[in-house]
Amino acid sequence: MSAKIALKSKVQLGIVPTHLRFVGCLLPDENGRYPRNDDGDIIVVAGVKELCEISPVKFTHVQVSFFPGTAREEIDAVVHGLKSLQLEVDFVLMVGGVNPMNPADEDAVVAQLLPNIEAAIAHGARSVSSTSIEEWMSTNETRREGADFEAAIAQNVKLHLRAMREAGIEGSCVESWHIEFLRPGEFKTFTSLERAWAFVSAANKALGRSFFKLLVDASHCGDSGLTIAENEALIARIAAAGELGIFHASAKTTRGCLSSDDGWIGAILTAAAKTGELRQVFVEIFDHADPALEALRNVEPGHGVDTRDGRTYTEVMADGLADVAHRLNNLAARGIIKD
């Protein structure tokens, strides 16, 4: 890394390498193997290495999506490759084609979660994260309210505590599980900080400790329908409860260049910093033409806008890292982030 910008606080900076695409990079093939380049290198590792080489700031973490059906030796190869770049690897536990809110799908959801939790433990991961509280882009679901919403929370608590127990998380290296809500359209029920926090709070109450955290993604906050002020107030309450988790610096609607965020990253990041509980910030950018996200573009055309402005996506990520590094340093300079 060229590391021209030195971080001036203890907040850890990382990336989510979705800018490399799901199709052709993060998604394994039918044999559970990752795509490789002409040199035989796993593309996600090669892509992150390129970013390390051009980034003006040293980042220390990478949050990788691991899908059900990925061969264990392939996961091992990705983790070892990323660790060789002096990066700590955080596991994103992906699930698909199943509904965590439906009791009939509980066994299937747990079966998808377990192998990657076990891999995370084997590799010494200190945190895992997931959106495993609802099915992505479901065409069968309607928004759950009232008693139906409470039932969805209860089922999710049952499912996630079962996954913890069966994977042997208690007493392992995994210190926290970060739950991410998604914008309306991607989800129908858990579509805001407030609604996702209801699950996190219930899960921790059932467990007896604050193990589950709420991942705060600036883009989803911006698209959730709540105002900046409403999100700021919720973040303060979530942090006071000991349930504030990882922060994603990502632009609302476009999910592209951070300059397209309409002010949301700055406002939500500052709100998290003011709590004194901000620990990790990850820059997340998506390729606007990723075939895996076509369904989302059909729901929200703004997701298909090309915000690169003549750059490659790796260059857009490098600029995003610089942007967030300066934000963190200036939050520290103003005394908002305190060490």
Mark where each language-model region is.
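Acidic/histidine-rich catalytic cores of soluble enzymes
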Residues: 61-62, 164-266
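Alpha-helix-loop-beta-strand connector modules within alpha/beta enzyme cores
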Residues: 80-96, 150-169, 197-205, 270-274
